[in-house]
Amino acid sequence: MVKIRLMRLGRHKLPSYRMVVVDSRVKRDGSYIELIGHIDPINGTNKLNGALAIEWLKKGAQPTDTVKSILSKEGIWKQYAASKKA
């Protein structure tokens, strides 16, 4: 199964994350299929490629709960739901 999940980066107590598409059997920080974006919770910045995320969701990639929440806040999940109905 292919998942969209977060990969942790950064040093101790200063995390940043990459949103990546991975095989569910791969370790959290293991190799990934494709990079969708960057998330920096310290500065509150998100740089996501919405079109790429929607493309992978249409292909059947399953987002984790945290990723789904982030996609909802960015408005990407709403775009995906609208494209799914059309």
UniProtKB/Swiss-Prot annotation:
Q: Does the keyword Ribosomal protein apply?
A: yes
A UniProt-annotated Pfam family: Ribosomal_S16
Gene Ontology process terms (BP): translation
Q: Which InterPro entries match?
A: Ribosomal_bS16, Ribosomal_bS16_dom_sf
**Keywords from the named record:** Ribonucleoprotein, Ribosomal protein
Q: Name one GO molecular function term.
A: structural constituent of ribosome
Gene Ontology CC: one annotated term: cytoplasm
Q: Which HAMAP family match?
A: Ribosomal_bS16
Q: Which family does it belong to?
A: Belongs to the bacterial ribosomal protein bS16 family.
Q: Which NCBIfam families match?
A: S16
Which protein is depicted? Small ribosomal subunit protein bS16
- Name the species this protein comes from: Mycoplasmoides gallisepticum (strain R(low / passage 15 / clone 2)) (Mycoplasma gallisepticum)
